Each structure stands twice: as structure tokens, then as C-alpha cells.
């Protein structure tokens, strides 16, 4: 993948296998960690150096000796919750302030009921300002991690599937 990305001028992102949504076969043993990725890439391409930057992006960026830049999203072994500024809005108007959230805020109903733009802005700002979501960090502390959401719950609430919220 990295060779292909380099050929087409794309900056590739690798992501650790996450225990979210329908990852019903997730286990820590199946996770290729950021460190594992860096080791494998270093052996294949030479020394890998970190690209130091102040950003809220979920990927940490790295450079190969030939100048190729790539990123790793290490949300399983080194979560980025402290700097996360992401949220997700589903196609049917549910707003989630964390990828790991099991509850969201219904924005469709108030919008369809005629909520003013100012009131909607206040609602969103109020919810965001009280945000305490740290889903990946909280999961990091669990020694016996199973999938975040059991398959039976996914059938009852499709919003819990990552593909419905862009995860």
C-alpha cells in the first residue's frame, strides 16, 4: 500500500484495528500496534522519523528516508482523545461526539420542528462544551476487552455500527 500511495502521490494512513461497532471478532492479539507498524516499515524502507507538528489530526505522521510521508492512527494503543475535535453526524440526524459513544443527540427532530439557527447553534455549543467523551482512553484501561458493542445490540440499534456514523 505504501508503494502504491507513493506512486500516486497520496499520503497513506494506517490505522490500528479498533474494538468498535461490529468488530465482533476483535481481540488485542489481532491488533498490529503503531510500534509494530513502525518496526516493519523501518525494516522495509529504512529509518522512520517522526514528523513533529501541533495538530488535532488523529494520525501521527512519519517520514521515510526518501521523503515519503505516512500516518498512523493509533487509537487502540495510544488514543488521541485529549486532542480530538471530531464529531459525527449520521444521515438521519444523530450527532455523536465520540466514535465510541453509545448515545447521541437527535438534531433532526428539532430542525424539522423549525428550531432557529441560533437555537441550534446554542444546542450544539452547549452539548460540545460539556463534552467529556474519552471512549478510546477509557477502553485502554480495560484489561479484558471484548467488542465495544455486542452483535445483538447492533441489530437493535444500527446507530452503533461504525459505518452508519462514518467510523
Located regions from the model:
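Radical SAM enzyme [4Fe-4S]-AdoMet core and its adjacent flexible, acidic
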Residues: 1-69, 109
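Residue-level detector of flexible, active-site-proximal loop/helix-junction positions
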Residues: 19-21, 77, 102
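C-terminal accessory regions of radical SAM enzymes
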Residues: 45-100
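Radical SAM enzyme core and accessory elements
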Residues: 79-167
